[in-house]
UniProtKB/Swiss-Prot annotation:
Cofactor or coenzyme needed: a divalent metal cation
Keyword terms, alphabetized: Activator, Acyltransferase, Cytoplasm, Metal-binding, Nucleus, Transcription, Transcription regulation, Transferase, tRNA processing
Organism: Candida glabrata (strain ATCC 2001 / BCRC 20586 / JCM 3761 / NBRC 0622 / NRRL Y-65 / CBS 138) (Yeast)
GO molecular function: chromatin DNA binding; metal ion binding; N(6)-L-threonylcarbamoyladenine synthase activity; nucleotidase activity
Complexes and interactors: Component of the EKC/KEOPS complex composed of at least BUD32, CGI121, GON7, KAE1 and PCC1; the whole complex dimerizes.
Catalyzed chemical reaction(s): L-threonylcarbamoyladenylate + adenosine(37) in tRNA = N(6)-L-threonylcarbamoyladenosine(37) in tRNA + AMP + H(+)
Protein name: tRNA N6-adenosine threonylcarbamoyltransferase
Amino acid sequence: MVDLNGISPKNKGYYVALGLEGSANKLGVGVIKQFVDGSPTEIVSNIRDTYITPPGEGFLPRDTARHHKNWCVRLVKRALAEAGVTPGQLDAICFTKGPGMGAPLHSVVIVARTVSLLWDVPLVPVNHCIGHIEMGREITGAQNPVVLYVSGGNTQVIAYSNQKYRIFGETLDIAIGNCLDRFARTLKIPNDPSPGYNIEQMALKCKNKERLVELPYTVKGMDLSLSGILAYIDSLAKDLFRKNYSNKLLFDKKTHEQLVTVEDLCYALQETLFSMLVEITERAMAHVNSAHVLIVGGVGCNLRLQEMMEQMCMDRANGHVYATDERFCIDNGVMIAQAGLLQYRMGDYVKDFKETVVTQKFRTDEVLVSWRD
C-alpha cells in the first residue's frame, strides 16, 4: 500500500490544492480537499470559462491565450472565495504542463508561477491526460478499469501497469473530438456550448436510422484513423449544400429528391466513430482481462457513446461502464488539482522553476504514477 501522507498537510486532517487548466479553449480553476484518512475527495470549487467562436470557426492559439490571460486571475479569486479558502491554506498549486496548445498553456502557467511566488506555495506540473483519468477514478469509484480517453486533442485506450498508464491503442492522425469539431465547422453549426454536443443533438433528430449512410471504417489493430472519414463526410456535406444531383447517395437519380439530411450525416458519423472506439476498447479489455471501462475526456459526455459501450460490456461477465457528466468530462481545474495533489503527497513537486516549462507534447505513458501500487 502506497503511503500518501509522507508530507504533512498545512490543515489538520486534509490537504488543499488549487488547480489551473487551460490547454485548449476551456479555462478551468478548481479547489479540492483530500483527506489524510482516505475519505473521498471534496470538491469545494469548480469554475470554468470557455472561449467560444462564431459558427464555422475554430479557435486560434493566440486568441485563446488572450482569453485565458484576461480571465485566469479573476477565476482564481472567484474559486478561492467560493471555496472559503485562503492562500495560506493551500498545500499546492497545480497547473497543466501539457499536452495542449502552446500559447494558452503559457498564459495559465504564468499565473501559476506568479501566485506560487506571492503566496509561497509549491507548484505541481500535471499531465492533462492523467488529470482526466484520476478525476474519473475518484468520481466514479472505478478501481482498475481500461480507460477510453476521448477529447478534442486525444484519442487513447489506456490501462494501468507497473506505475504507468500504458497506451494500448490510439488515433494515428486526428483526435475524435477534432473530427467532430471540424465537421461541425463544415455544417456551420454553433460552437456554444460545444460543437460535439450540437452534433449529438442533431444526430438524435435523424429519422432514417435504419438507412445508415456508409462511411469509411479504419481500424488498424489497436489503433484507428479518422482523417479519411472526415474528408469523406465533408465532401458529402458540401455536395448536399451545393445540391450536386449527380451524387446518387444523396439524391434520387430521376426525381432529384433529397435522400439524406444533415441529421442523417451527423448520426452516421457518430455511429461509425463510436463503433470504432468500442472495437478497440473491447480488444484492450480482452488483452488485460478487464470487464470495466472508464470513459474520460470531453467526448465522454456523449450519451450515445456511453450507451454503445454499455451494450458491449453487457456481453462480458460483470461488465461495467464508468462515466461522468460535463462537470468532470470536459476540461476543468479540479482534475488538475486531483492528480497534482496526489503527486505532491508523494513528494513530486517543483524544486526549480525550469521544471515549470509547458509542452505541447506530453504523452500519458511518460508519467511515473507513484501514488498507485
